[in-house]
Amino acid sequence: MGRIDYLHDPDAPLANSVVPSVVAFVRDGAGRVLMVQRSDNGRWALPGGGHDLGESIADTVVREVREETGIEVQVADLSGIYTDPGHVMRYDDGEARQQFSLCFRARPVGGVLRTSSETTQVRWVDPADLGGLDVHPTMRLRIDHAMDEGRATPHIG
């Protein structure tokens, strides 16, 4: 299913849903960041997805990272809450979703990199190389906040 992101765009569709979702900022022992290239829009992002009924939010993080990348993680902490009503995602099925995303830092504890139906590429990326990837500005904000380990409190916005 295709997706178009609108960010403070007057031509954006009106949102008709809000789905709690997560993304995971995962760094390996070399300090590289786990990134996925999404199959729905071709952009690079942190792995993540929607929260399912019956799950704790930490379980959602673990499941989504495993599903999209093959990597097993342990959730460390919350780096931010992202609820910008000016960020709307339109999907091919007519859904127009307002952003509602929790970003968690997580540690890899096992697994082997692989793609999924939601990812065309999965790789560990040196932080110095992140600027060369096509990353949506709201995802870049999450990455920047998660990389700032000196933040005393999570981002709320």
What do the predicted segments below correspond to?
Residues 24, 78, 104-106:
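A structural signal for short, well-ordered beta-strand segments
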Residues 28, 32-68:
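Conserved Nudix-box catalytic region and its N-terminal flanking loop in Nudix hydrolases
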Residues 42-43, 112-157:
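Nudix hydrolase/Nudix homology domain
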Residues 72-82:
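A short coil-to-beta-strand element that immediately follows conserved catalytic motifs
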